[in-house]
Amino acid sequence: MNTAELLRKIIRRENLTEDEARSIANSVMKAEVPEIVTAGFLVGLATKGESVEEITGFAKAMRDNALHINFPSALDTAGTGGDGLNTLNVSTAVALLISQVYPVAKHGNRAVSGKSGSADVLEALGYNIIVKPELAEKLIKESKFVFLFAQLYHPAMKNVANVRKTLGVRTIFNVLGPLTNPANARYQMIGVFSKEFLPKLAEAVVRLDYDRVILYNGFPSLDEISTQGITYVYEIEKDKIVSYTVSINDFGLKDEIPVSKLTVNDATHSALRILKAFKGKDEEARRFIGINTAMALYLIRKVKDLKDGYEYALQLMDSGIPHVRSLIEKNGDLSNFNKLVEKID
């Protein structure tokens, strides 16, 4: 089926097969079709609603066109973003903490709609975000942490960047980042911008051959575990999917923290709040990071439940600042980090 026939199929609101989606995604990322056709596919899919097969096919195509490192046992904590709430970079904080006890290949990018992306906050801390594959494998083996910058590891995405920017609306590519980790990480925490998208993404995860993944969407449509209200969770192990909800009570906590108290102005502010939380000088941020770290510890089976996970997370935060310093010493510049630490002390 040629490109025009596939486009007509979408216009008729018919779903593409996984192979059809993979084929057109490869053509798009290799710039084999005009930008106007790419725009037609992206808008058509968004209007129709992306199917499980289409998400899976596009994710496999992104993997086909990516640079890779070999570390499938790693954990990633990348979310979809796009919740518009401008909270501190909790998934990056979790990645830094977990790397004290388990290898983390943190896949991420600069902010698109928010105040600070994972690349931005790591850069604000002084970490070198441009890490090529050979060095990346060395770092994760030696220090249990590496950042895999999406712009570097997905060079073919430059061929759709202009279309995405011009359209200015959410497309299928917004949900693909977490599904395309360059280390082929088989353990993953994925925050999702909408709870309605969770079942569909869970089915795609099953098709993409992970070992264990936890998807979640917290109140109020936050792509993190929330300190306020209910968080919807989908836990996937191989081909088994279990869904449930959690609240702060499941972590052994009582008082909710409004999400409005967890916002940041920019990447430097986010970095500062993370370090303050590690130091015990920002209680709201500490709890937010703590419950998300607890879920990650549960995912990688370091704890039996979320209450134990939260207690363990507090211990990891207590040693968080020296650990982050050691990561930056290996791959970065301590100037920014030291200035931030001075502001805390």
Curated annotation (Swiss-Prot):
Its cofactor is Mg(2+). Disulfide bonds: none annotated. Anthranilate 1 binds at residues 79, 109. Homodimer. Its EC number is 2.4.2.18. Pathway: Amino-acid biosynthesis; L-tryptophan biosynthesis; L-tryptophan from chorismate: step 2/5. One of its GO terms (biological process) is L-tryptophan biosynthetic process. This is Anthranilate phosphoribosyltransferase. The gene is trpD. Belongs to the anthranilate phosphoribosyltransferase family. It catalyses: N-(5-phospho-beta-D-ribosyl)anthranilate + diphosphate = 5-phospho-alpha-D-ribose 1-diphosphate + anthranilate. PANTHER family: ANTHRANILATE PHOSPHORIBOSYLTRANSFERASE (PTHR43285:SF2). Mg(2+) 2 binds at residues 223-224. Binds 2 magnesium ions per monomer. GO terms for cellular component: cytosol. Keywords: Amino-acid biosynthesis, Aromatic amino acid biosynthesis, Glycosyltransferase, Magnesium, Metal-binding, Transferase, Tryptophan biosynthesis. It is an enzyme of class 2 (transferase). Mg(2+) 1 binds at residues 91, 224. It comes from Sulfurisphaera tokodaii (strain DSM 16993 / JCM 10545 / NBRC 100140 / 7). Anthranilate 2 binds at residue 164. GO terms for molecular function: anthranilate phosphoribosyltransferase activity; magnesium ion binding. 5-phospho-alpha-D-ribose 1-diphosphate binds at residues 79, 82-83, 87, 89-92, 106-114, 118.
